[in-house]
């Protein structure tokens, strides 16, 4: 007869979780469900996802980004910029098996909580990092969220709207996939530590996960002549669509002078900065757009105002300006364009498989480990190639 509290695979393991929003917390949630003790580290007042809510008839607003991915965790609130908080986190990390973090590259090092800082005190610590773009070079240190990463990785142009507008995926596909990949990588690192005594530094980039999800489609463009440089599609006469339920506007594809740009600026400070950069500071005080929820309710009017301002520059000009000022914006690339971008090359996302004339280029799996290169370049086997090895009678 089963016991009321059966053993779980991660019983006795402690995880220190510095992540927020969706992808990182989902990885922590997987570990909680497998038995780990996960201590969530939040800023005073709690992480931002606690405030992103949806309204359902007859009940208070639900924090639909926060609630599904933080079940059973423990929470501490600290200001990581203070020396007291740093010392508290160092002591906690001394007792942990895993650290999860998802800040922009270099942030934890500036706080004195990077992998070298923590692992010099706790050599058995596995340090798992989630980033938007990998932090591998000049194109990889930008901030990014699901919508923008998906667009830049080619996910929004394969099935455009009837008007030609990039199709925004209506749920957090890249976030959720990245969370599961990060959890898988942590489990592999724990097994590596238990079997081989190696405590690894694990890295997962959401962009790499998004590319990996489209490996079949991108392979077609990796194994033929080079494509043209990325360029926005011509702007069609677009119809308006209804507002969305989540209070995360503006987060969509918007028309510019020559095509579409994908922008996510729903955080209050980002919204204010966007308004000033596009020359519309008056929108900050406009009551229709004063809060996240009102911007969502008045989505059609919001889109009209933004596109009126964005019509003054090309999509590429806006991307350069907004990114230079720390906002999340990108072109919605096609698959053909993705494989020719500097970011794609910077993240070392391809493998040469096979030999000679049979060599093909494929997409590698996204998780990276400091202690070994997680790739195999042998070609797939022919059907039944190993029958004699495994099916022969002893």
Swiss-Prot record:
Gene Ontology molecular-function annotations: transferase activity
Enzyme nomenclature, EC number: 2.8.3.-
Descriptive protein name: Probable fatty acyl-CoA transferase Rv3272
Subunit structure: Homodimer.
PANTHER family: BLL6097 PROTEIN, SUCCINATE--HYDROXYMETHYLGLUTARATE COA-TRANSFERASE
Active site: 175
Organism: Mycobacterium tuberculosis (strain ATCC 25618 / H37Rv)
Enzyme class: transferase
Task of the protein: Probably involved in fatty acid metabolism. Binds to fatty acyl-CoAs of varying carbon chain lengths, with the highest binding affinity for palmitoyl-CoA (C16:0). In vitro, alters the cell wall lipid profile and protects mycobacteria from acidic, oxidative and antibiotic stress. May play a significant role in host-pathogen interaction.
Classification via Pfam families: CoA_transf_3 (PF02515)
Lineage: Bacteria, Bacillati, Actinomycetota, Actinomycetes, Mycobacteriales
Transmembrane spans: none
Entry remark concerning the domains of this protein: Consists of a large Rossmann fold domain and a small domain, which are connected by a flexible linker.
Family, similarity comment: Belongs to the CoA-transferase III family.
Key words, A-Z: Transferase
InterPro entries hit by this protein: CoA-transferase_III_domain (IPR050483), CoA-Trfase_fam_III (IPR003673), CoA-Trfase_III_dom3_sf (IPR044855), CoA-Trfase_III_dom_1_sf (IPR023606)
